[in-house]
Amino acid sequence: MRLDERHYDELRKIEIEAGYITHPEGSVLISAGNTKVICNASIEDRVPPFLRGEGKGWITAEYSMLPRATAQRTIRESSKGKVTGRTMEIQRLIGRALRAVVDLEKLGERTIWIDCDVIQADGGTRTASITGAFVAMTLAIQKLRAEGAIKQNPITDYLAAISVGIDSQQGLLLDLNYEEDSSAEVDMNVIMTGAGRFVELQGTGEEATFSREQLNGLLDLAEKGIKELIEKQKAVTGEVIE
């Protein structure tokens, strides 16, 4: 049994609250245990210069963390005047993952900006951001369709992400909190579609190597968690695949 009394294959308590912020076209607060992220989706009727005249849209993301989202205060990146490599990596990951499940031509020449702001961090902030961002994006696209701005549904599948890892004492674990992530011998972030296809895997043997058998176990565990997350998403968005 883990410190928070979860079983090895059990998600933290997942809550997705829609309409958390008034102004964005899509907005949610996603909570994964003590990790909480506000995910907003904003629509602009223009695309980056490299896509002008191409007849397709774009999806991009920004990610940030409040100074006291963590146990010790961190300096705002805006105060430093530059974005850290970690932040840049996560931003690109979120945008890349969302684009994998959207037909950009059906979106038309518009951009969906995803803003993920971590207000409390206890591990899994990037995976929670992706899971919440998909819901925020879907709500924004549903609004576009309701207004008649687009006729066809550009979303091709659901999308969610989760962390898995290997602990020297407890073995395989699903949905690591900060303490578990810090002590894990192996940790991995897995992004998958509703059809069970992989979008991205980020895995590292921090303190130990791992076998093919263990890798398969991690992926099976991640797939189980992602199926559960997608059911949570559907409770907010309804069925979005036509």
Swiss-Prot record:
Reaction catalysed by this enzyme: tRNA(n+1) + phosphate = tRNA(n) + a ribonucleoside 5'-diphosphate
Origin superkingdom: Bacteria
Segments forming a coiled coil: none
Gene3D superfamilies, sorted: GHMP Kinase, N-terminal domain (3.30.230.70)
GO annotation terms (biological process): rRNA catabolic process; rRNA processing; tRNA processing
InterPro entries, per database record: ExoRNase_PH_dom1 (IPR001247), ExoRNase_PH_dom2 (IPR015847), ExoRNase_PH_dom2_sf (IPR036345), PNPase/RNase_PH_dom_sf (IPR027408), Ribosomal_Su5_D2-typ_SF (IPR020568), RNase_PH (IPR050080), RNase_PH_bac-type (IPR002381), RNase_PH_CS (IPR018336)
Keywords of this entry: Nucleotidyltransferase, RNA-binding, rRNA processing, Transferase, tRNA processing, tRNA-binding
Pfam families: RNase_PH, RNase_PH_C
One example GO MF annotation: tRNA binding
EC number: 2.7.7.56
Binding of phosphate, residues: 86, 124-126
Family: Belongs to the RNase PH family.
HAMAP family: RNase_PH (MF_00564)
Function, in words: Phosphorolytic 3'-5' exoribonuclease that plays an important role in tRNA 3'-end maturation. Removes nucleotide residues following the 3'-CCA terminus of tRNAs; can also add nucleotides to the ends of RNA molecules by using nucleoside diphosphates as substrates, but this may not be physiologically important. Probably plays a role in initiation of 16S rRNA degradation (leading to ribosome degradation) during starvation.
Quaternary structure note: Homohexameric ring arranged as a trimer of dimers.
Family matches, as NCBIfam families: RNasePH (TIGR01966)
Annotated protein name in UniProt: Ribonuclease PH
Organism: Bacillus pumilus (strain SAFR-032)
